[in-house]
Amino acid sequence: MDTIGHHYIVEAAGCDPKVIGDADKIREIFLEAAKRGNMEVKASYFFKFSPMGVSGVVIVAESHISVHTWPEKGYAALDVYTCGEKADPEKAVDYILEQFKAQYAHVSEIKRGIEEDDETFTHTILTWEEKLDRRNGKL
């Protein structure tokens, strides 16, 4: 079966609270992540909660990139879903984690699709965790 889409669900911890608490900064990061992931941006919306936290989404022709943040915990929940052949969601995820200065990431990749003429849904789930080494600004 051909995969219709790649859905990355990311738990990011140890993030810089100043970055993940700034809706404008996150928008900037997501727009660049979409570019690096070879995605075509269609729209974006970000909302800053009071007193803290951000939720936002970038709609791309290939699907979406979304986030919910808890700066007080240094935590961000990311969702990157793409379909088609040209997008590279992993590049987008890597860039976002780097910009958030995440110290730890748990990533699940779900390969999504449906069998042609069968209406049988197929999901393949790959999961990995990594402690991110960010000494001297290098991953």
Curated annotation (Swiss-Prot):
Modifications after synthesis and translation: Is synthesized initially as an inactive proenzyme. Formation of the active enzyme involves a self-maturation process in which the active site pyruvoyl group is generated from an internal serine residue via an autocatalytic post-translational modification. Two non-identical subunits are generated from the proenzyme in this reaction, and the pyruvate is formed at the N-terminus of the alpha chain, which is derived from the carboxyl end of the proenzyme.
EC number(s) on file: 4.1.1.50
Subunit structure: Heterotetramer of two alpha and two beta chains arranged as a dimer of alpha/beta heterodimers.
Catalysed reaction, written as an equation: S-adenosyl-L-methionine + H(+) = S-adenosyl 3-(methylsulfanyl)propylamine + CO2
Annotated gene: speH
Modified residues (Pyruvic acid (Ser)): S63
Entry cofactors: pyruvate
Top-level EC class: lyase
Assigned protein family: Belongs to the prokaryotic AdoMetDC family. Type 1 subfamily.
Site (Cleavage (non-hydrolytic)): E62, S63
Textual note on the cofactor: Binds 1 pyruvoyl group covalently per subunit.
Active site per the UniProt annotation: S63, H68, C83
Function according to Swiss-Prot or TrEMBL: Catalyzes the decarboxylation of S-adenosylmethionine to S-adenosylmethioninamine (dcAdoMet), the propylamine donor required for the synthesis of the polyamines spermine and spermidine from the diamine putrescine.
HAMAP family, per the entry: AdoMetDC_1 (MF_00464)
GO molecular function: adenosylmethionine decarboxylase activity
Protein's UniProt name: S-adenosylmethionine decarboxylase proenzyme
Pathway assignment: Amine and polyamine biosynthesis; S-adenosylmethioninamine biosynthesis; S-adenosylmethioninamine from S-adenosyl-L-methionine: step 1/1
Gene Ontology CC terms, in alphabetical order: cytosol
Keywords: Autocatalytic cleavage, Decarboxylase, Lyase, Polyamine biosynthesis, Pyruvate, S-adenosyl-L-methionine, Schiff base, Spermidine biosynthesis, Zymogen
GO biological process: spermidine biosynthetic process
Disulphide linkage map: none
